[in-house]
Amino acid sequence: MQFYTIVSLFLAGTAYALPATSANGYEACPSGGLFGNPQCCSLNLVGVLSGDCRAPTKTPNSAKEFQAICAESGQKARCCGLSEILELGAFCQKPVGVSA
């Protein structure tokens, strides 16, 4: 019985995405809050609700690079919560240092 409890806790702990931190220490979306998942989103409703979000193709080294990575696919850099559900970044905000 204890074995199943330990395995369940381990699997639950690994289900959370690790923050994408670059080699120089830049963290696109600081973890620990609602907006901890870096995403590239193409839909944006009223500045908070976003859709069609996907993880960046590589780990950005700066806010400017994060913006450029997303712009390559016609999307905008965002920090989102609930991004794993049907590719819908339900709650997103603009990362610090990103202009658009």
From Swiss-Prot:
UniProt cross-references to InterPro entries, sorted A to Z: Cerato-ulmin_hydrophobin (IPR010636), Hydrophobin_sf (IPR036686)
Signal peptide: 1-17
Cell compartments where the protein resides: Secreted; Secreted, Cell wall
A single Gene Ontology CC term: extracellular region
Family named by the database record: Belongs to the cerato-ulmin hydrophobin family.
Disulfide bond residue pairs: 29-79, 40-70, 41-53, 80-92
Alphabetized CDD domains for the sequence: hydrophobin_II
Keywords: Cell wall, Disulfide bond, Secreted, Signal, Virulence
Keyword 4Fe-4S: no
Predominant subcellular localization, coarse grouping: secreted
Upregulation: Expression occurs during infection and is directly regulated by the transcription factor FTF2.
Native source organism of the sequence: Fusarium oxysporum f. sp. lycopersici (strain 4287 / CBS 123668 / FGSC 9935 / NRRL 34936)
Protein name per UniProt: Class II hydrophobin FOXG_02746
